[in-house]
Amino acid sequence: MKYTIVPAPRNLHDYVLELLEEWQPDCLDCEYSHGSPSPPTLHDLFDVELETSHSPFVGLCDSCAEADTDSSASTEADSGFSPLSTPPVSPIPPHPTSPASISDDMLLCLEEMPTFDDEDEVRSAATTFERWENTFDPHVGPIFGCLRCAFYQEQDDNALCGLCYLKALAEEPASAGAEEEDDEVIFVSAKPGGRKRSAATPCEPDGVSKRPCVPEPEQTEPLDLSLKPRPN
């Protein structure tokens, strides 16, 4: 392999200057003015040419806008209304300082208030019960001591008032069959079909009973539910 050795130039400075002149870019040749009055526009940067011809639609729109403003100004001048003036506020009617006069007829209540008796039953002043009570003779006819019940019986109604009905329910004796049912005791065993029903009998003496009553000893230890065989 052969190697060629380029002889070094005699003057290195002159050689570098020659290389710089050969490699000098084109942008260095353009002239730049440092004292420009205004920054460049987009048209200058992108080389966009403006159209010098005037569009006819622009003039038409301008003329229409001027005509509208002239017509609106003439109508406002005729009506005497200025656009900057605010509409007047409607006056608030003054309220009278003295209180309103209320007649006595307006304060009267035309409805009749109901009255309440001892049983808290609402009745008016002209009910049929009061008319019947005024003309009723308590010494004539079967009376159970209650005017309400007598009033219902006079009208051929087999009914009682609420208070007498509750008293009759409270005084009704209990049936004998219900007492016998209460005395029955039902024994239930663990075996299926081992349900036995018997009537409770008074306690028999210890000598007559087949099995003497032995008191159950008191449990002092906790109940063991495990499956382990218990020690003997």
From Swiss-Prot:
Residues in the signal sequence = none
According to the record, the residues making up region (Interaction with RB1 in competition with E2F1) are: 40-48
Entry keyword set: Activator, Early protein, G1/S host cell cycle checkpoint dysregulation by virus, Host nucleus, Host-virus interaction, Inhibition of host innate immune response by virus, Inhibition of host interferon signaling pathway by virus, Inhibition of host STAT1 by virus, Interferon antiviral system evasion, Metal-binding, Modulation of host cell cycle by virus, Transcription, Transcription regulation, Viral immunoevasion, Zinc, Zinc-finger
**Regions annotated as coiled coil:** none
Query: Motif LXCXE motif, interaction with host RB1: where?
Result: 107-111
Keyword field contains Zinc-finger: yes
Q: Its GO CC terms?
A: host cell nucleus
So what family is this one in?
Belongs to the adenoviridae E1A protein family.
Query: Which protein is depicted?
Result: Early E1A protein
Q: Which organism is it from?
A: Canine adenovirus serotype 2 (strain Toronto A 26-61) (CAdV-2)
